[in-house]
């Protein structure tokens, strides 16, 4: 069978290994497996959301309110914007896909950092667009601008992942706003802020505000309920932009693109500030332990504004480290697919991190 040509160039996105795989392959009891590979919230779903899901299960036979009125109103109030400046997606990934299908094509280019979220390239290639990357693996706005100015007539979409996944670095928000002002109004700047809650907690200067983003004619802010709000399995994301951008992307959204349980979970999670605060407090207390461990063991790391930390290695190979840890029942994220000898580790609870340090120290001896 003949398929579209762009598929020849595409690779499958490599998701973090599931707990079930470790149970099957290594015979380890599920309760003894620690998954720190996919940047999920280590505290699991909040109690308030759990109770809401039990209640909403009775209505699983009903389609959700496709206007997502209550969720949009909650987000609008939180961010100081109107609900008309919001779009809801099945994860923020879906809105990335909308943005590219709205703006990119075979005659255009898409610009991103040297190492960043893999789905940008995967979705961009579906449109036939040319991929431009900075030479710097981390975000360097001067280099972004240099490449953009050299290919201004071609580049239709720019992705800034702030904080950046899978490395964790971030840039001051004021620098980001200045950058957008240097970009032509017909080029869409996508600000993927999936970890913005973490960046804001660590350093308020890194907080990108949706209320500022909507002032630009050519920018969209993306957020998610997967990380700080612990709803990775619910798949709820959102975009915030001016009404022209939201109107265009909404034409690509199928009806009922999130589920009735997902919608209720997101509405309840949005109001659970206590849970989010607990998440942030634990994250950066435990992050300090990882930084101390790295320094004590001569491991290079990237200062992180997220819920993960990336360790860079000379020896041994990251794939060897991850495989040995996997056999111990600890799932980490090998970054060899990004051409890095590095391991990304989600910040867990204290007891989970204790096991990581114990096992990793043995491997590195």
UniProtKB/Swiss-Prot annotation:
Q: Which residues carry this modification: N6-(pyridoxal phosphate)lysine?
A: 227
Q: Which UniProt keywords apply?
A: Amino-acid biosynthesis, Aminotransferase, Histidine biosynthesis, Pyridoxal phosphate, Transferase
Describe the reaction catalysed, as an equation: L-histidinol phosphate + 2-oxoglutarate = 3-(imidazol-4-yl)-2-oxopropyl phosphate + L-glutamate
Q: Which InterPro entries match?
A: Aminotrans_II_pyridoxalP_BS (IPR001917), Aminotransferase_I/II_large (IPR004839), HisP_aminotrans (IPR005861), HistidinolP_aminotransfase (IPR050106), PyrdxlP-dep_Trfase (IPR015424), PyrdxlP-dep_Trfase_major (IPR015421), PyrdxlP-dep_Trfase_small (IPR015422)
Say yes or no: keyword DNA-binding present.
Answer: no
Q: Name one GO molecular function term.
A: histidinol-phosphate transaminase activity
Write down the top EC class of this protein.
transferase
Subunit composition and interactions? Homodimer.
Its name, as the record gives it, is Histidinol-phosphate aminotransferase
Q: Which organism is it from?
A: Campylobacter concisus (strain 13826)
């Amino acid at each position: 069978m003949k398929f579209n040509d762009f598929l020849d160039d595409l690779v499958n996105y490599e998701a973090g290994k599931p707990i079930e795989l470790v149970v099957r392959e290594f015979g380890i009891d599920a309760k003894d497996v620690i998954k720190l590979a996919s940047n999920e919230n280590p505290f699991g779903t909040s109690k308030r959301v759990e109770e809401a899901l039990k209640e909403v299960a009775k209505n699983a036979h009903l389609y959700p309110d496709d206007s997502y009125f209550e969720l949009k109103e909650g987000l609008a109030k939180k961010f100081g914007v109107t609900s008309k400046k919001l779009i809801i997606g099945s994860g923020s990934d879906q809105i990335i896909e909308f943005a590219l299908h709205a703006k990119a094509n075979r005659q255009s280019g898409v610009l991103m950092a040297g190492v960043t979220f893999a789905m940008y390239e995967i979705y961009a290639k579906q449109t036939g667009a040319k991929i431009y990357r900075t030479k710097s693996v981390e975000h360097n706005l001067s280099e972004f601008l240099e490449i953009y100015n050299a290919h201004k007539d071609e580049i239709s979409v720019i992705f800034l992942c702030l904080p950046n996944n899978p490395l964790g670095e971030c840039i001051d928000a004021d620098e980001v706003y200045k950058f957008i002002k240097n970009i032509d109004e017909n080029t869409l700047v996508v600000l993927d802020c999936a970890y913005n809650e973490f960046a804001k907690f660590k350093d308020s200067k890194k907080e990108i505000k949706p209320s500022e983003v909507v002032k630009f004619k050519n920018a969209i802010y993306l957020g998610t309920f997967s990380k700080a709000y612990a709803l990775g399995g619910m798949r709820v994301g959102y975009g915030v932009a001016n009404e022209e951008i939201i109107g265009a992307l909404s034409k690509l959204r199928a009806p009922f693109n999130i589920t009735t349980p997902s919608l209720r979970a997101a509405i309840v999670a949005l109001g659970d500030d206590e849970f989010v605060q607990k998440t942030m407090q634990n994250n950066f207390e435990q992050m300090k332990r990882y930084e101390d461990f790295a320094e004590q063991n001569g491991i290079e790391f990237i200062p992180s504004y997220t819920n993960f930390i990336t360790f860079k290695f000379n020896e041994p190979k990251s794939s060897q480290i991850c495989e040995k840890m996997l056999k111990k029942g600890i799932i980490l994220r090998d970054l060899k697919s990004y051409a890095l000898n590095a391991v990304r580790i989600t910040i867990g609870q204290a007891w989970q991190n204790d096991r990581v340090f114990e096992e990793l120290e043995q491997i590195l001896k």
